Amino acid sequence: MNKKPLEQIKNVTNVTGYRQVSLWKREDLQHPQPDELAEEVPVALVYNGISHVVMMASPKDLEQFAVGFSLSEGIIEHRREIFGMDVVAVCNGLEVQIELSSRRFMGLKARRRALAGRTGCGVCGVEQLNDIGKPVQPLPFTQSFDLANLDQALAHLNDFQPVGRLTGCTHAAAWVRLTGELAGGFEDVGRHVALDKLLGRRAEVGEGWQHGAALVSSRASYEMVQKAAMCGVEILFAVSAATTLAVEVAERCNLTLVGFCKPGRATVYTHPQRLIAG
């Protein structure tokens, strides 16, 4: 592939995730005004020289995305199975070049599939309907979360959306400690990608983020539930609703799924035994 850098992303280590543009407002179509738009670029994950998937994503925090995607898709089981990564600008987007352990790469080749990405859509390109669901080990019940602490987390979720505050165009995913404090978070134009970035960072942090919950600014799709469960996350909070398939998957894998998370409000779909009313 031609390794010419993108005009918009010449330095892949120092990107903002947005671009200055000129546009027109309804009340004045004669005079353009400055504004910001969120960047959306094709990102290819390349394992040991073989391109596996292309996703549309924000061009930030791509190492965390690669780790999280690799874990949540079952390509690896541990962060240490990735030996190295490089982010490279190519003619049509970005590549994350990932060096996998030999054992994991052999497993990937055995079940390799080609996905052509929409915005963070992980179903696009799946060859058969039976390939959509992944086997997930039922989660243990090792923690409880006091819902009285959820409002604190919700109040600070926007802290991890600097591009979203400028553009109104990103989703967020954050890690909530059992105290309600947000330990960290990520944003992306794709909700699944934002969650993958969070899961990747959680794997890098290790024990410090073992207990707690994931909080996403979007709806809860089946795939987000599956990704969380694949990474051992026991509780998933979503600002919007859950789908029927998301609830079915959460029930089956013992994940506590909570939607419509707003100040003073939460709707629990599955496994309320991990929660304390508040």
Swiss-Prot record:
Q: Name the predominant localization.
A: cytoplasm
GO biological process terms on file: Mo-molybdopterin cofactor biosynthetic process
Q: Which GO terms describe its molecular function?
A: sulfur carrier activity; sulfurtransferase activity
Active-site residues (renumbered): C121 (cysteine persulfide intermediate)
* Cellular component annotations (GO), alphabetically ordered: cytoplasm
InterPro entries noted in UniProt: Cytidine_deaminase-like, FdhD
Listed Pfam families: FdhD-NarQ
Q: Which residues bind Mo-bis(molybdopterin guanine dinucleotide)?
A: F260, C261, K262, P263, G264, R265
Location of this chain's protein in the cell: Cytoplasm
Which UniProt key words apply to this protein?
Answer: Cytoplasm, Molybdenum cofactor biosynthesis
Q: Which domain of life is it from?
A: Bacteria
Transmembrane ranges? none
Role noted for this protein: Required for formate dehydrogenase (FDH) activity. Acts as a sulfur carrier protein that transfers sulfur from IscS to the molybdenum cofactor prior to its insertion into FDH.
User: Which family does the record assign?
Assistant: Belongs to the FdhD family.
* Name used for this protein in its record: Sulfur carrier protein FdhD
